Amino acid sequence: MKTILAIAFVWGMAIQTNAQEMNKVPTVKLNNGMEMPQLGVGTFLVKDDAAERVCHAIKVGFRLIDTAQGYGNEKEVGEGIRRSGIDRRELFITTKVNTTEMRGGTVRQSLDKSLADLGTDYIDLVLIHWPVKGHIKETWQILEEYVDKGK
């Protein structure tokens, strides 16, 4: 059975829900044993009020937060996470490494910047944003290195 991860863009939408119902969102068990919510909130094109919107999304029950360095809002997303008051371990944070960062040292710098900007010790899922030919294996190996370090 295929499961589709639905990213809900709640910005500007009138969504009425309660956190108790949102906590019933089904999860997908990943190969490493982690549970990933099937419903999350995306932060693409969210700039000025990203912290407020992320905080609100978490307070109404969203637990998967999707962002990327290329969105230019990881600091604000991290601020929203902190403001929510929800324990980090209850959240599933996804970010992305830009194609332009797909080289040894720059991958590490990119990941370290994301960790710092998000204000977290670890990221649950890191994707390669628009992977292109070349450096994919090297980038993948560095991502595995960060997993082994618990980051």
What is the predicted role of each segment?
Residues 89-93, 123-126:
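Residue-level recognition of the N-termini of beta-strands and the immediately preceding loop/turn
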Residues 44-46, 68-70, 96-100, 128-131:
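Active-site beta-loop-alpha junctions enriched in small/polar residues
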Residues 102-151:
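Glycine/proline-rich, positively charged
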Residues 4-15:
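Sec-dependent N-terminal signal peptides
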